Amino acid sequence: MNKIKFLDRSLVQKIAAGEAIDRPCSILRELLDNSIDSGADKIEVFLEEGGIRRILITDNGSGISKEDLKICYLPHTTSKINEEKDLEKIQTLGFRGEALSSIAICSNLTITSSTTGEDSYQIEVENGTEKYFKKQSAINGTIVDVTNLFHNFPARKRFLKKDSIETKMCLKVFEEKAVTHPGIDFKLSLNNELRKVYFKESLINRVQSVYGEIIENNKFGKIETEYENVQMKIFFAPPNFSRKDRRNIKIFLNRRPVEEHNLSEAIIDGHSRILTNRNFPICYLFLEIDPRYVDFNIHPQKKEVRFFNLPFLPKQVSSNINEFFDRERKEILQDYHNIIIKRQITNDAHLLHPEDDPTNSDFQTYEIIQNESLILDKPQNNKITNIIEDKVKFESQNPIQKDKPSFKSYIQNILLETSTIANDFQKPIAKHEFKYRGQLFSEFLIVEKDNEVFFIDQHALHEKIIYQTLINSEKITQKLLIPIEFQVDCEDTDKILASELEEYKKLDIIVTKIKEQTYQLESIPNICNKYENVIIQFFKTRKSKTIDSLETDLYATIACRQAVKCNDTISSEFSQFLINEFFNLKLKYCPHGRKIYHKISKFELEKSVNRK
């Protein structure tokens, strides 16, 4: 007796339907694709009970003719392709001819459509079989009504989540379609209540409309570029809005959401200079690629894609993001450098022309070289460590008094001895009007400003100030008196480290490979003195990231060790210095990606106690 048998036709259809349709959001995705492919510029979605009870979609697209309506629900019927070579130039979202037939098998399906704006026709299909076909009053476009999902698939229905979770999944699909088609009006109603409305707008505005709440309505950064056969647009959140998972890394290829590991890693790699391994960016990558170079026909729900002859793509994504943040960082560091120099000149002007000095002289120019030596020792007794580089020209109408300390010496004393700078901290450049209300839990600084209360993490803030100074300082190669030998345990780490030896030299770090998995550290930057172990530990845990992460991670670690800690009690003068730096530099996040502060408005506070 034969063991191999032909399956019943209805069973074959159920198996096929189970591959394409696994929950309500799958149906919503397929129906939205059909509406978009029809050329509609207005689409409305109605969901009941997370789509399990009902999914209704209306559009004003080209519609379905009477003849096509009679066969559209049958397996492998499609208007998108005609022959095999059409698979190489797919421009539409749908193309397999499986969606409507799968939906018709596992639910009750009713379609009403018109191509003329006059007579329309309606077909109802139950369990894959036509129930009726009739003429209806005129409509403009198409209405698709799906009810009682999986009523004949009890096993599949048991695996559905509760309504609220299925609703969230449907909302995710709706947002993905809305964000990739900004030229279409979208509306979404949940249980007869209008919840989402998006009107026609530009892509950046649509991204802001759909995902802006994630970053508290701050503005997304934008990169737009074009290569041969590829158009690339990248939108990303400010780095202080990082996440602990990858859920907000989204990739859209030819207006389809796809899951592509190499591109996701490229986005993470592009943010590696500003985010740590424990944090992930909020980033949306939009790619438009000639259909000849991509293949979507490898996944039942078209979530995966295969590229042809585009090996440069991940590297370009990473490089574009890196270059953007490089420019941003240089601007921030230059602002920081200018503020430091300007504050010193302003605060210490009384050393050069005291008010009580009647002496007058001709206009003179002085050139002052500041801090040739780099000071990085742990501050003791609430001392501050700051590093000031370069030369500045100072103009004065009075000469320096001989019985007063030099300008350079006085600056060094100010920066290193907190106990002697109470008055100077009260006179910074661009002094912000704020009220320092004290230290909370020996961890937070409480500040009142413009009807808002700020709770500032003292360690994160001080850490960021030191980090920005370190990253902007001049580095000099310092040869170790006795080279340090170390080993790496992993072969992959060995290969990565060996391939990057020349790159480390650009950071004034010289490391030599002695034998397999054995290296020797010979030189380091002068600012890393006493931190050889930090560098070696970094080598031992090296992963496939850009070389710039070494500089970022290393200086973040040093800054972390130098900064005041949680449970440190600090003086009021030092606190106010940190606070003024916070407002001057507009600092939002520490080198490790954590938020530096939390704020609450007077209105919010009053509202919480029912005063508003």
Curated annotation (Swiss-Prot):
Coiled coil: none annotated. It comes from Borrelia turicatae (strain 91E135). This protein is involved in the repair of mismatches in DNA. It is required for dam-dependent methyl-directed DNA mismatch repair. May act as a 'molecular matchmaker', a protein that promotes the formation of a stable complex between two or more DNA-binding proteins in an ATP-dependent manner without itself being part of a final effector complex. GO terms for molecular function: ATP binding; ATP hydrolysis activity; ATP-dependent DNA damage sensor activity; mismatched DNA binding. It holds the Pfam family DNA_mis_repair. SUPFAM superfamilies: ATPase domain of HSP90 chaperone/DNA topoisomerase II/histidine kinase (SSF55874), DNA mismatch repair protein MutL (SSF118116), Ribosomal protein S5 domain 2-like (SSF54211). The lineage of its organism: Bacteria, Pseudomonadati, Spirochaetota, Spirochaetia, Spirochaetales. Belongs to the DNA mismatch repair MutL/HexB family. This is DNA mismatch repair protein MutL. The gene is mutL. NCBIfam families: mutl. InterPro entries: DNA_mismatch_repair_CS (IPR014762), DNA_mismatch_repair_MutL (IPR020667), DNA_mismatch_S5_2-like (IPR013507), HATPase_C_sf (IPR036890), MutL/Mlh/PMS (IPR002099), MutL/Mlh/Pms-like (IPR038973), MutL_C (IPR014790), MutL_C_dimsub (IPR042120).
